[in-house]
Amino acid sequence: MRKLKILFSMALVLATMVLCMIPSFAATSNKDKVYTALVKNGLSSAAACGVMANIEKESNFNPSAGSTSGAYGLCQWTGGRRSNLFSFCSSNGYSSNSVEGQVAFLMHELRGAYSGVLNSLKSVSNTADGAYNAGYRFCYDFERPSNKGSRSSQRGSVARSSYWPTYKTRDEEIKKAEAEAKKKAEEEAKKQQVIDLVKVFDHYGIAVEFVNATL
């Protein structure tokens, strides 16, 4: 048996200090948003790099990008596919000019009419050469620009030389960040419990001490 003192003022100050130490995070770039969404939808880092190389050339990662031909968005959808993009986003609670909505629609297309492209993306090795192959196949079979042979080769090269060095280990980093975020959320829940308990003590005037508490 021993005396356990609980000081309300000290607990409140401590809780405030802990909350002030919570870090703030900068806004995520559109490139990172696209990469994260693609990986969460089952693509490897190499496959995601291939898609991103194409998005760079199509829209420079601007989901509001348009053209005189009526093309729109990250992948410059036209005609009926552009209309389908708007309908999909409206039906699924996305803004049609959001990265999240457009990547969701992209995956919707890849799982549907363009399932062959998705199979190609999933078959590439998770290597620099795999990034090249993903960039080439996505351009050749999905984007289908004029001079698609030479452009597919160019985009494959961009995927291999520009995106793969940056993103080759990013999926591991995402998993690590998610684990850390979960841990932080659990810690915050515990901090909130302390704050709530202190408020209860204060409400009932239990701020000085508990005497003869059993440990």
Predicted regions and their residues:
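Peptidoglycan-targeting cell-wall enzymes and recognition modules
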Residues: 28-33, 59-130
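Export/targeting segments at the very N-terminus of extracytoplasmic proteins
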Residues: 22-53, 57-60
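Extracytoplasmic/secreted envelope proteins and their assembly/folding machinery
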Residues: 31-35, 48-52, 74, 100-103, ...
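Short, low-complexity, charged amphipathic interaction modules
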Residues: 193-215
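Sec-dependent N-terminal signal peptides of Gram-positive bacterial secreted proteins and lipoproteins
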Residues: 4-24
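Intrinsically disordered, low-complexity, charge-biased segments
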Residues: 172-193
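Acidic helix/loop microenvironments that form the catalytic cleft of cell-wall polysaccharide enzymes
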Residues: 55-59, 121-148
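A recurrent domain-boundary module in secreted/ectodomain proteins
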Residues: 153-178
